[in-house]
């Protein structure tokens, strides 16, 4: 079932790029409402669960291996699953509970009143020739404009910057390696996007298999962001409202993982 859903939505993504809007397959009761409030839960690596407006969106479920070896499998209930690629550290959809809809192709989508944009960004520093393209996801939920960059490795170009605008919340890879931004590249992307809040992702933690993980810890990124406020949560989840975000400048938010 998961494979059929994934393939169906792959085709739909190509259609919506040409201007066709997907009809929602979710219950009308899940439609986005004007009232705000968003829960952001970190499930390890680049995997997050976003809950707001009665909708649960899971991004980048993974298989525990390599840099994610010590994390628990993120098998959580969701209404919609977004994946940045079909690599095991950000696109493992087998075994997810329930029957969520799955999107993985770039394009414009409308699901239960929420408009989502999948934006293609190279997954390596070779124009995608090694690892193909990564899909960054842009949407509004709970009154928050969210950009999840997945495993982006190429700079944000002018066309992408115009399409994205200024996000409220950016989730950005910072640990480097061959498939995603290193700390300096992440800093440049943050500068280009000027988000209100930055949540670093894709960095080395104690979950890593030391013999099979090439990414670095988050501290290197934080050092480069000298002068920017850093908040550290004592849990893996935060609740956000638009009023919590700075009007000027950016703040870095770190979440904790309970190993």
Residue ranges and their predicted role:
Residues 3-27:
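N-terminal export signals
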Residues 22-51:
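C-terminal segment of N-terminal export signals and the immediately downstream linker at the start
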Residues 26-27, 33-35, 90-135, 139-142, ...:
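Metallo-beta-lactamase
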Residues 39-42, 56-62, 115-122, 138, ...:
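Active-site-proximal beta-strand elements of phosphoester/diester hydrolases
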Residues 47-106, 117-134, 152-163:
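Pre-active-site segment of Zn-dependent metallo-hydrolases
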Residues 77-79, 168, 196:
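Conserved acidic residues
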Residues 115, 131, 197-259:
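Binuclear metal-ion centers of metallo-dependent hydrolases, dominated by the metallo-beta-lactamase
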Residues 125-193:
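Active-site-proximal loop/helix segments of hydrolase catalytic cores
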């Amino acid at each position: 079932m998961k494979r059929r859903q994934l393939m169906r939505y792959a085709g739909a993504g190509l259609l919506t790029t040409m201007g066709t809007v997907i009809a929602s397959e979710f219950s009308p009761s899940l439609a986005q409402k004007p009232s705000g409030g968003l829960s952001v839960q970190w499930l390890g690596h680049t995997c997050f669960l976003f809950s707001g407006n009665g909708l649960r969106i899971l991004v980048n479920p993974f298989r525990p291996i390599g840099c994610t070896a010590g994390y628990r499998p993120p098998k959580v209930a969701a209404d919609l699953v977004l994946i940045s690629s079909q690599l095991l550290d950000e696109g493992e959809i087998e075994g997810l509970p329930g029957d969520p809809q799955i999107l993985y192709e770039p394009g414009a989508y409308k699901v239960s009143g929420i408009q989502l944009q999948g934006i293609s960004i190279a997954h390596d520093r070779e124009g995608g020739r090694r690892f193909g393209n990564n899909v960054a996801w842009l949407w509004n939920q709970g009154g928050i404009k969210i950009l999840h960059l997945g495993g982006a490795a190429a700079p944000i170009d002018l066309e992408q910057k115009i399409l994205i605008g200024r996000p409220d919340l950016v989730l950005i890879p910072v640990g480097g390696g061959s498939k995603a931004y290193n700390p300096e590249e992440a800093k440049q992307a943050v500068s280009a996007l000027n988000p209100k809040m930055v949540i670093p992702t894709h960095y080395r933690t104690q979950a890593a298999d030391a013999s099979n993980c090439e990414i670095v810890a988050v501290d290197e990124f934080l050092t480069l962001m000298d002068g920017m406020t850093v908040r550290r949560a004592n849990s893996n989840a935060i609740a956000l409202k638009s009023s919590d975000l700075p009007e000027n400048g950016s703040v870095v938010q770190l979440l904790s993982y309970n190993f």
